[in-house]
A protein has these predicted regions:
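N-terminal mature ectodomain segment of secretory-pathway/periplasmic proteins
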Residues: 1-73, 98-147
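Acidic/charged, solvent-exposed loop-and-adjacent secondary-structure segments enriched in E/D, K/R, S/T
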Residues: 67-88
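Surface-exposed amphipathic alpha-helical segments
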Residues: 138-140, 147-171, 286-310
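Extended beta-strand-rich segments in extracellular/periplasmic secretory proteins, especially
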Residues: 90-147, 179-187, 191-232
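Short, solvent-exposed recognition patches
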Residues: 24, 32-34, 183-288, 298
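A generic structural motif
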Residues: 49, 72, 121, 147-148, ...
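Residue-level signal for well-ordered, solvent-exposed loop/turn and beta-edge residues enriched
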Residues: 74, 113, 138-140, 152, ...
Length: 310
């Protein structure tokens, strides 16, 4: 059932309305969008809420996304990250099943449809990490809930309505003409050979010597953050992810809109932010600036941080 759910968008075409809720310790966010998806890999999201996104849309064509910003009259073009493809391919599915137990909860109904409920529990911690509501007939995930390490609901994404149909015109997935095209964040060609990426970073980069049980390398690349050449290393256990960013400058990742708390990484000053299931931890040592971003508890990120430069 789980593998069927992962593969469902590759052969199902549909339209619908989706609501997403992200629950953070400092703020919560909600969004509503219409979606048109044409199998195997064309989709478009039309945002209805919040007001700041109303009228904007995102077109996905294979691995390329076009974010249409109507207020700025521009289209931001970017390549999908591996983070967006977690458990979407067979190798990631193998990682997931080696780290999580999938069990059935009592069936439910959605808009007259029978729904199978699958609960994913981490084999090492015993914690429930994800809960999926899957259309029993088509295999499509109709609702997804993600839980933080403390057991609190961190994210909920669900269809408010859905219609399966192949009558979706290809013109919906065409990028509007006349708008300015802008390249998204600059990133190098990603590689799953992380040691090679570290060696080619252009500065004395480091990788973690410790990872929580079940986490494996996914990919690494060099990105441009605030004009600073930054090495990005990504690890995953099939559901949760952790990213290590490092550079010669002081380009923080994602701290701008949050109030950070001070802490220590071994003998170095550090700061962290908790936002729902995601934790950010930043520190500097040996002339480098590091930021860890992961769906892990602070104690786990601190262990990873301490292992980067033992």
């Amino acid at each position: 059932m789980l593998h069927t759910a992962i593969e469902a968008p590759h052969h199902l075409s549909y339209t619908g309305e989706i609501q997403t809720l992200n629950f953070g310790s400092q703020k919560s966010e909600a969004a509503i969008y219409r979606i048109e998806h044409r199998a195997p890999n064309l989709s478009r999201r039309w945002y209805l809420a919040p007001q700041s996104l109303y009228g904007d849309s995102v077109i996905s064509r294979g691995e390329t996304t076009y974010s249409i910003d109507v207020k700025r009259d521009r289209v931001v073009v970017a390549q999908d990250d591996a983070i967006d493809d977690q458990v979407a391919e067979d190798d990631n599915f193998a990682v997931l099943t080696s780290n999580y137990n999938a069990t059935f909860a009592p069936d439910e109904t959605f808009d007259g449809r029978n729904v199978r409920v699958v609960v994913l529990t981490n084999k090492f911690t015993g914690e429930m990490t994800m809960r999926l509501h899957i259309d029993a007939q088509t295999g499509l995930v109709l609702e997804k809930q993600i839980y933080a390490a403390n057991g609190a609901l961190a994210m909920q994404e669900r269809f408010e309505d859905i219609h399966y149909t192949a009558a979706i015109p290809t013109g919906l997935f065409e990028v509007p003409k006349g708008m300015k095209l802008v390249n998204g964040p600059s990133r190098g060609l990603p590689s799953n050979d992380l040691q090679h990426v570290i060696a080619a970073a252009g500065f004395p980069a480091h990788g973690p010597k410790y990872l929580p049980e079940g986490f494996e390398p996914v990919e690494g690349d060099v990105v441009d953050i605030k004009g600073v050449r930054t090495l990005h290393l990504l690890y995953s256990d099939g559901i949760r992810t952790v990213s290590l960013f490092q550079n010669h400058g002081n380009a923080d990742v994602g701290f701008e809109n949050y109030k950070a708390t001070t802490t220590r990484v071994e003998n170095h000053d550090a700061k962290y932010v908790e936002d729902g299931s995601t934790m950010l931890l930043a520190w500097s040592e040996s002339g480098l600036h590091f930021t860890l971003v992961g769906e892990l508890a602070l104690s786990e990120l601190e262990k990873i941080a301490a292992s980067v430069i033992p």
